[in-house]
Amino acid sequence: MGDDRNIVDTPRSVSSVNAAWMQDRMVKNAMDFSQFSPGVYAEAQFGIPGVPYIRGDLSQVYYGGQLSLYSLNSTPPSLNGVDSFDIVKGPGSAVYGPQGEGAGGYTDFVMKQPYFDRQHTEISATLGYWASGHSYSNPSVTIDTGGPLSDKLAYRVSYLSRYGDGYYLNDHDQTQDVYFAVTYLVSSRLKIEAWTQFFEDRTNEVVGANRVSQQFIWNGTYVGGPASPVTTGPNAYFGYDIIAAPNPPPNTYGTYADGTYVAVNPATAYTVKLPSYYALIGPGDTARSMLSQTQIKATFDLTPDISIVNRFLNYFGHSDKFEASSYSEFVPREQSVQDRLELHDEFSIGKVDSNLITGLDFRYSGLTSYQDYQTQPFGYYDVYATVNTFFYPGYRYEGNTFGGGLQVPGGAGFSASPGSDGSQISNVYDTAAFIQDDIKLTPKLSLTPGFRVDRIEAYAENPAFVQVGFYNSNFQYQPLATPIYIPAGGSSPYTPGYNNSDTVTDQSFFLSLNYKLNETSSFYMTYDHVDAILGTNNFGGVDGYTLQSSLTTKSTLYEVGYKESFLGNTLYFSSDVFQQLKYGTQFTGPAFPIKDEGLELDLVYQPNKRWTLNGNFTYQDATAFGTYFYQQTGNYLDYYYPTTTVDGQPGTGLGGLNFVGYSPPGGRMRAPGIPQVQANGFAEYRSPMGWGVGAGPQFIGRQYANDQGSLHIPGEIEYDGYVFYGRRTWDVRVNVKNITNKRLLDPIAVSFAGNDLIYVRPPIEASLTVRLHF
């Protein structure tokens, strides 16, 4: 909310995760967040999960109450500098500002702070991982140290180094990460807190296994064998769509195949149990990102009741990916500069107490991005037989692109798709004024209204390209004899560009009513209605093709909840019911409305220093509305001929990819991939002798793996745990994930690729962590 109120008095569903939970349960990315909070689910997101799903929609990350740039799976947030985090449902408050993407909720990182009492040093080393059937090396070391330099100045430094591989063949997981923080007590009235961070990593997109079927979901039975373009049926020879020579005569048809409209040859097809560590990753595939960010907070106390707070956040990053099978991404600039000035005033009018926050907020965000997923022939590859030889068959014929025919100037090997909002240069200037007042009407009843107005100026255009080919009116790729340079915002005779700008005024309203039955409880009702930017699915930014609607996307939250702390603050319980109305984005296609309604329960119990228990439960009914949801392939059976039986059904022989859209009956369907029921529990015991154990289940209910509901992932239970032993200056911990060695899966980009791909999580795996404390 932008103030210092406690979690019980916050009129929102909030879950707090402390440093001990993060360390003990080895929180590494957004896929680990759901165990701590109801309403949170994190799918694999192509192996680089940057943000979780909250209440049926994507979410965003804040740092100390300031909005970070959105990144679905390109630049994942670093946790090296994070001391704890809060998971908040719904839009950001009047003070924080609503999210620019992912209106479901947000994760607010609380950064590591310097120590003023004495010098503290911790060295932590993790060795692993021992996994069933396929162990892999991924050691990491963290050095975290800090202390006072004087009675007014203190510092903290944390360095993380991780080398080695991920679980899947050809997967990498490498990071170098430095975090530095200082706190300076300038005077009794002025305090300055600052931190800066730089990290770079090399990982891989893990798109999972292809040729998905229900039998593969159930038991790993995979249909192998070579695939080629279908030569019968309504899509016969559509896969031969690359013309050999430039400037062909009219009505020339292609002679080369690009991997689309393919079906597995029934004469050579076979079935095999696919190892879970086989995925569509080539030996030369890579995903790299770099991020530099700095935050400075200055607090000046004018009087005991009035203070001025200024928060500054600067963020700059870039990333790139190259997957020889299907995808190219080049993001040379992700930039954000935000400065928020706040006036905090506590005052009384008669018997009514107020805690007022008002101020001004300015935020600039800039993005330059290219991506090419014009043709992603997932079903063309036999993952079992050709795990080290994935290469897009049309790459050389299509001018070293993945079907887009647009090269990136100065970005050797990278390419772009025409007409994609993922290729953009955008600059957004957001100037806002806000006010929020926590009004204590009676000792038990308080009202918190808020209002925010954002004046947004946005400029968006296509970036510069070098065009080497295009798709003609017959959907045939035609190479150009002479490449054409297209300047930023420009066009060619074959590819229209765009250069748009707009200015809008977004108004957001917030209202909460809070009633305290006693000092340790609260019953609240919240209504929030916000206008905010809805950017692109992958990188945020804006949708330059539909700029005005992109800048004024509405989201509404209705929430009623009850919270209480019992038994001398050893037991915390919260419950809420909610309805959220918002918009989601597609990789290809228009934004679509989402309505999510549900019930959330959360409990934390620490009766003494030995026992800690927590659990949560979610029931949600998330519905997506729309008449068109783009699909790479319309039916998973399209990859098989009618003479091939899969899941007891004959193939359609249509071939995939086949670039279609799905129109759900009645214009509505369950939100793609979102489970209706989730539950998590965990218990930890610490012996006075220094040893301890923790374990608990994570349950995810049935999930539809494609829009049609013809593929589903049954309910899954994953048990994780650890054992440890420690003394005052050291401790040792062994973590085990998926203790019961269950087959666990996640949907991937359900609307877009649900009929093509599915993600298989690792089986049982273990790691060893040793920590030294000084």
Range-by-range predicted roles:
Residues 81-83, 95-179, 186-190, 292, ...:
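Outer-membrane beta-barrel translocator/receptor signature
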Residues 1-117, 560:
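Acidic, small-polar-rich N-terminal luminal/periplasmic segments of exported/outer-membrane proteins
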Residues 185, 353-365, 424-582, 596-597, ...:
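Structural signature of Gram-negative outer-membrane beta-barrels, strongest in the C-terminal barrel
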Residues 177-369, 559, 572:
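Outer-membrane beta-barrel domain signature, strongest for Gram-negative TonB-dependent receptors
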Residues 292-316, 332-465, 516:
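Face-selective signature of the C-terminal outer-membrane beta-barrel domain
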Residues 206-278, 326, 376-421, 459-503, ...:
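Solvent-exposed loop segments that connect transmembrane elements
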Residues 622, 699-706, 724-774:
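C-terminal beta-signal and adjacent terminal beta-strands/loops
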Residues 570-571, 576-583, 590-708, 740, ...:
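Gram-negative outer-membrane beta-barrel transporters
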